[in-house]
Regions:
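Domain-level signature for soluble enzymes in the chorismate/prephenate branch of the shikimate pathway
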Residues: 1-245
Length: 245
């Protein structure tokens, strides 16, 4: 087959593909239109719910109610979407509807890119105002002062147990725990240097250093260990210095 014939055959295949896809895309567009109408109706009902909550002085965010909805979504899901995918979609729907009732500001231990930010978005969805704080104390102060509606802080991990500073702050303030989320955490030793022997110091949050101490003792005993405010800050510092990881 000549090159010209191959090109003609390919063009014909593309034409046939487009003929089959076109009606399916029209159907998808119609389903999208219906979804938008239904989501708008849901948002309108959420506004009505918000008015009732405001009348009775109730909180807009009810994590137990949202958890019930996500559980119900999994129960009535006929497929082919997997439950975790459908629940992720519904989390964002609820987050967007909640935002038109009241815009929540959520403080977390920053900067951006920390596990705390990840937990915040997994719990509240993306339709919130994020407030990154330099310390756990700042998170608590932001909520107490009314600058943030909620705060997200680490309270325990499976390898090192409870985070003592978080527990102290819970005892010293009148703030209460209103919800919880567990997220998997994996650490990696990263550096711009391609030779580990050239790296002199490893930076990380104190909890991360404690969690990784056995691995570091075996694989990188020569590295000095320095605690910093967050793993995200450690990554930022290491990204510009080949002697850091």
């Amino acid at each position: 087959m000549t090159k010209d014939n191959q090109e003609k055959q390919r063009q014909e295949e593309l034409r046939q593909e487009e003929l089959r896809l076109a009606p399916l895309r029209i159907k998808i567009d119609e389903v999208d239109r219906q979804l938008i109408e239904l989501l708008s109706r849901r948002a309108g009902l959420a506004l009505e719910v918000g008015h009732v909550k405001q009348e009775f002085g109730s909180a807009v965010f009810r994590p137990e109610r949202e958890r019930q909805i996500l559980e119900k979504i999994a129960q009535i899901n006929p497929g082919p979407l997997k439950n975790n995918g459908l629940q992720a979609i519904w989390l964002e729907i609820m987050s967007a509807c909640r935002a038109i009732e009241e815009q929540l500001t959520v403080a977390y231990l920053g900067p951006a890119g920390t596990f705390s930010e990840d937990a915040t978005l997994q719990f509240f969805g993306h339709s919130i105002e994020l407030m990154d704080c330099h310390s756990l104390d700042d998170v608590f102060r932001s909520v107490q002062a009314g600058r943030a509606t909620y705060g997200v802080v680490p309270i325990e991990n499976s390898s090192e147990g409870a985070i003592s500073r978080t527990l102290d702050l819970l005892l010293d303030t009148n703030l209460i725990i209103s919800g919880e989320i567990s997220i998997p955490i994996e650490h990696a030793l990263l550096s711009v240097s391609t030779d580990l022997s050239q790296v002199k110091q490893v930076l990380a949050h104190a909890q991360a250093l404690a969690q990784c101490q056995e691995w570091l003792n075996v694989h990188a005993p020569h590295l000095q260990r320095q605690a910093v405010s967050s793993n995200a800050q450690a990554a930022k510092l290491a990204s510009v210095d080949p002697e850091l990881a």
